[in-house]
Regions:
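Auxiliary Fe-S-binding modules of radical SAM enzymes
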Residues: 1-132
Length: 132
């Protein structure tokens, strides 16, 4: 893949939109925002619902040449398309809140201390981005 050309924006948008149609609204679709830094918010319109593991602390180890966007910018661009940026744990909220996975008592207690009633990180983006 290293010698393969990157997919164009049109190819990526088509792929995301097709995946959304085929996989349905319950499937989580990710597109890393750092791989199309100029216009990454367009993928929200195509059907993604997750930016993946964006980190303000680490580089993208898979694509170290592509820095993560600032969280405030990611939040602003998401909001511009009508979406609320919400931090989550590595486990998707529905897998915990709907009990799709078996959990030990210790793990369940630890996760419950970290999440809100919707299964997202308590405190939301205000834990990571200063708000006015």
């Amino acid at each position: 893949m290293q010698s393969s050309p990157d997919a164009s924006d049109i190819e990526m948008l088509w792929t995301v939109a097709t995946a959304r149609i085929l996989l349905g609204s319950e499937m989580n679709l990710q597109v890393p925002p750092n791989l199309s830094a100029d216009n990454y918010e367009i993928y929200l319109e195509a059907g993604i619902n997750d930016w993946g593991g964006v980190s303000p602390l680490t580089i993208d180890y898979v694509n170290p040449e592509a820095p993560w966007p600032q969280l405030a910018d990611l939040q602003s661009r998401s909001a511009s398309k009508g979406f609320e940026l919400r931090p989550r744990l590595p486990i998707y909220p529905e897998f915990f809140t709907k009990s799709h996975v078996k959990k030990s008592e210790m793990l369940r207690t630890h996760i419950e201390n970290l999440i809100d009633s919707d299964g997202y990180v308590k405190g939301g983006m205000s834990r990571y981005v200063a708000t006015d």
